[in-house]
Amino acid sequence: MADPNNPITEPKAIIQSSTSSSVTIVPVPTCGDSLSDSATCENPCPLDTITTTTTTVCFAAPSSTASGNDINTLMATDTDISRRKKNPVYRGIRCRSGKWVSEIREPKKTTRVWLGTYPTPEMAAAAYDVAALALKGGDTLLNFPDSLGSYPIPLSSSAAHIRCAAAAAAATRGAAGAAVKVGQKKEDKVYDTAESSTMGFVDEEELLNMPGLLADMAKGMMVAPPWMGSPPSDDSPENSDGESLWSY
């Protein structure tokens, strides 16, 4: 039994920690065997040292209990963003109150040139092309590069002249679009008329049995004509023998 007046004191564990690692000292109470009730270890064994490394986590792992709706929402958001990036958009235009506004920023300036408001995006895009050619030159990117030779040229680089030429190009683009729509409507109308006339056609030859009638007439023409006797010397009724009609 241990002496209460002289208790055995064991070395306490010393723990040093830092943000990257921690050192833990584990005491060994005896030199192999356990201490007796009346003796103390005068030369205790060296203390064992165990070094452990602490890792700091700087991100949160995804929760395994995340609902399927949250995952679907994230996937839909990514899809919408990629779809918006892939959709073709004309340069220099934006939609406002159901109409399309066209404007361009002057090179090396913070000011913008207002080019007008148009009912269709194609008209606004054509207006931007004219202004871009006037301010940036022929190497600039255009909405309709095929129409480069047909665009009007502003008299000068002033905002008023550029706006006037842009409006003319937009009007031409709008008229061309309207002509295409009218042509399509006419083609559809002609097609509908032809289809209706085809549906109302009546084959009269088939209705009157014309092929059979013609065949009967051909057969009749191949029949030999009836035999006729010698005519009487006198056409008077007295000299007639009563057999002036055909006899078969």
Swiss-Prot record:
Q: What SUPFAM superfamilies does the record tag this protein with?
A: DNA-binding domain
DNA-binding region in chain numbering: 89-145
InterPro entries, per database record: AP2/ERF_dom, AP2/ERF_dom_sf, DNA-bd_dom_sf, DRE1A-I
Q: Where would you find this protein in the cell?
A: Nucleus
A GO cellular component term found in this entry reads:
nucleus
Q: Write the record's keywords in alphabetical order, separated by commas.
A: Activator, DNA-binding, Ethylene signaling pathway, Nucleus, Transcription, Transcription regulation
Gene Ontology MF terms: DNA binding; DNA-binding transcription factor activity
One GO term under biological process is: ethylene-activated signaling pathway
Region named Disordered = 225-248
- Tell whether Nucleus is among the UniProt keywords: yes
**Family stated for the protein in its record:** Belongs to the AP2/ERF transcription factor family. ERF subfamily.
Main role? Probably acts as a transcriptional activator. Binds to the GCC-box pathogenesis-related promoter element. May be involved in the regulation of gene expression by stress factors and by components of stress signal transduction pathways.
Protein name per its UniProtKB record: Ethylene-responsive transcription factor ERF026
What is the native source organism of this protein?
Answer: Arabidopsis thaliana
Q: Which gene encodes it?
A: ERF026
